[in-house]
Amino acid sequence: MSERTEQESYTDKIDEDEILAGLSAEELKQLQSEMDDIAPDERVPVGLRQKDASHEMTVRDCTEPESEEEIDEDEILAGLSAEELKQLQSEMEEIAPDERVPVGMRQRDQTDKPPTGSFDHRSLVEYLYWEKESKRMLEEERVPTTLLPSQKTNEEHEAKNEDKVEELELVYEEIVEEVEGGQGDAVVDEVIEEVIMEVEEEDKVCDKPVKTDLDATDPTVTSEDGLQRPSESADANVEAKTDQSGLDTETKVNEEKKEDSTEPAPSSYENWVPEKEERVISKLKIPKLALGGNTFVKKTARPSGNETNLESTLDKIRNNNPSVTDVNLNNIENIPKEMLLDYVNSLKKNRHVKTFSIANTGADENVAFTLANMLKENRSITTLNIESNFITGKGIVAIIRCLQFNETLTELRFHNQRHMLGHHAEMEVSRLLKANNTLLKMGYHFELPGPRMVVTNLLTRNLDRQRQQRMEEQKLQQMKEQRKVMEMYEDSLNLPPGMLEMLGGYIPLSLLQNCQNGAEDIPEDSPEPSPQPSPPHQLCKTQHLAPQQHPPNLSTGNLFEEVQLKKTPKRRDPLLEWNQCDERKDGRPNVHLRSVPKKRSIAREGPVDERANLKDMIKTLKPVPRRREPPKVDLTPRDHLLSEIRQSNVAYLKAVPLPKILESQETSLF
């Protein structure tokens, strides 16, 4: 109780009024702010209990002129270098950022690397435009839409307006700081200038003087917030000049200043005014893609990079121009469907186009059916590429069905369609391809393993047939060349035509040597020299049939002694023929004579008989089997026991002695 009474007596001794009376105005404000934080007023909403720091700062600045007189900010700023000013500016942006700037844009630029190129605002806007258009085109592909008549008329009006002169509107936002002071105060005024520039002509720039107006509603800005870096403002000015180069501009200026401005205080930093910051809002003319003046080309189509001139190429195909052998329309998404159908129809009678590619052109079922009809009549196209389109299984099946009437197409590609082909369509494709013998390549991955294997086997079959045809053509070419060689030798040897063929293609070596000697002895003045003999590799077949040695000193008259001629039936002598009437009268029997082949000399038929006898002897021989003896294996007692058990019978059991190896002390009975 004693302690409590002491505390009460101590509080009674403290007079709050005297304490508050002894405090200065600054201490009273500080005490009030602390009391607002410790015990806020409950009648004030929670969201409004936060104290206004900016108001306190302004009041403190107004109520403390003495402290500001002691610190001269202008002198301090004037003594700083350009690098120190930049560092101070960056630090002030981090400590007290501008509340009018969005939070996401308050991050300062921390890159030290110099820019690789100048900033191109126009290219950035075009890039954003094409990004937006690509998304819109994807949405159009997902949900097909049809334009109403009112929408079509609106688009026509927009197209007409785009043809007129576009206006480029540039809005410059200039921040001008003026250091003004009164009674030792340094107040910085912010002047915002908006420059609206309109384009009229090129290569002319007109500048007008700046008009200033005062407005009391502009908030006060401190020197820290309004300080601008000279280098950044200069860069912004250079960017603005690059954007407005070559454009005629008209400027209209509105400026705002703070009310009750006083004369500027003398300082070495007061004449410096930062460069203006420019905010450019431009209306750009998007290029309208006109393809050969066609009126039904999409206005929002993306550039494909394909430089094919559609109209001139179509005219060449219709006129059957032989210079056009490869038609490439890939990635032209804005090609009209009517023009695509005209291309396909014009290829029906064309005889020179070998490759036709329409990948990623938006081809649909109508184009697929037209392609099928074209393949029935066309006899020149070898490669067809219709990948990345909107063709369904029905269109693909129609094209494959028409391949049974086409014998020139060797490569077909239809992969990556918008819709799946389907299992039924894959089975139908594998079935229809059996009737085609010329297709060698197919650009499609089958989902089912069955059709995949069937199509693979069919393409392999077609490749084998093509290889066989190529081999047959080579054989025919070789036969033609050999026939020419034989005719050449017949002419050189003065033999009747077909003589060497009757001889089985055999040409004696002596004839060849004489032909070569004769060809060498022919004078150069002879008008028709005998043809030279063919290379030895073409005569190897004719020489190895009956190789014989001939003496080198044979005369030209005995050349045909070694040639074996075929025997032809002799004609009967009419003097020796009997008259049939006389035979009937005399009653003589009819006698029919038949020719008996003469026996050849033994000397000539000797080697032939020996060969025949040798062949007969070889036929009588039989292969002698090599009977190898089985390897000797020593049988163990266990094997003997098992063999005896296998040979024994249940009805006739007999005692079998136990082998000594199997005996042991456990099994022994004694």
Swiss-Prot record:
PANTHER family documented for this protein: LEIOMODIN-3, TROPOMODULIN
Phenotype reported upon loss of the gene: Morpholino knockdown of the protein causes short bodies, bent tails, and reduced tail birefringence, consistent with abnormal skeletal muscle organization, in fish larvae, 3 days after fertilization. Larvae exhibit reduced trunk size, that generate less force than that of wild-type counterparts, and aberrant accumulation of alpha-actinin. Mutant embryos show abnormal motor function, with reduced spontaneous coiling and diminished touch-evoked escape responses.
Region (Disordered): 34-72, 94-120, 139-165, 202-274, 517-556
Cellular compartments annotated: Cytoplasm; Cytoplasm, Myofibril, Sarcomere, A band; Cytoplasm, Myofibril, Sarcomere, M line; Cytoplasm, Cytoskeleton
Gene Ontology biological process terms, A to Z: actin filament organization; muscle contraction; myofibril assembly; pointed-end actin filament capping; skeletal muscle fiber development; skeletal muscle thin filament assembly
Keyword set includes Cell cycle: no
Tissues with expression: expressed in muscle (at protein level).
Gene transcribed to yield this protein: lmod3
InterPro entries registered for this protein in UniProt: LRR_dom_sf (IPR032675), TMOD (IPR004934)
Function: Essential for the organization of sarcomeric thin filaments in skeletal muscle.
Lineage of origin: Eukaryota, Metazoa, Chordata, Craniata, Vertebrata
GO cellular component, one term: myofibril
Comp. bias (Basic and acidic residues): 40-63, 97-112, 153-163, 205-214, 249-261
Family: Belongs to the tropomodulin family.
Keyword tRNA-binding belongs to the record: no
Coiled coil: 150-183, 464-494
Name of the protein in its database record: Leiomodin-3
UniProtKB keywords: Coiled coil, Cytoplasm, Cytoskeleton
Source organism of the structure: Danio rerio (Zebrafish)
GO molecular function: tropomyosin binding
